[in-house]
Amino acid sequence: MAIERTLSIIKPDGVEKGIIGKIIGRFEEKGLKPVAIRLTQLSKAEAEGFYAVHKARPFFADLVKFMTSGPVVLMVLEGENAVARNREIMGATDPKKADAGTIRKDFATDIEKNTVHGSDSVENAKIEVSYFFPEVQVHAYEWKKLA
């Protein structure tokens, strides 16, 4: 199995609800370790650039407005098959369609305020990680097992 890195974002609704630790804990419990993490407020330009692939979609303006409405947590998660594993942990984009026990089913309000973002492919993960984190800000480390 391949060790991968993926971008995860705890969106403004997740930060506002005070569930940052719970979300990170879910990733760690499933073998994804944060190797870079930052709390920040996205500018309009950053959000528009990051979501540029959706620029022609009718929801683009609302997405940018939401993603700039409050702080977000940007993370690089590392682990075996990190992209697919992250998407499983998050659940379906629409919380109503998400499986029980996923982040979106448990914490999200609706398809817009769906609490988390995760890269959708290995290729996009590389692009998304580099958008927010220069390589020097990503730190590999080994987990030590507790006795």
UniProtKB/Swiss-Prot annotation:
Put simply, this protein is called: Nucleoside diphosphate kinase
- For this chain's UniProt record, which GO biological process terms are given? CTP biosynthetic process; GTP biosynthetic process; UTP biosynthetic process
Write the record's keywords in alphabetical order, separated by commas. ATP-binding, Cytoplasm, Kinase, Magnesium, Metal-binding, Nucleotide metabolism, Nucleotide-binding, Phosphoprotein, Transferase
Q: How does it assemble?
A: Homotetramer.
Q: Extract the Pfam families matched here.
A: NDK
Catalysed reaction per UniProt? a 2'-deoxyribonucleoside 5'-diphosphate + ATP = a 2'-deoxyribonucleoside 5'-triphosphate + ADP; a ribonucleoside 5'-diphosphate + ATP = a ribonucleoside 5'-triphosphate + ADP
Q: Where in the cell is it found?
A: Cytoplasm
Q: Which PROSITE patterns match?
A: NDPK, NDPK_LIKE
Q: Where is the active site?
A: 117 (pros-phosphohistidine intermediate)
**Signal peptide location:** none
Q: Name one GO molecular function term.
A: metal ion binding
Q: What does this protein do?
A: Major role in the synthesis of nucleoside triphosphates other than ATP. The ATP gamma phosphate is transferred to the NDP beta phosphate via a ping-pong mechanism, using a phosphorylated active-site intermediate.
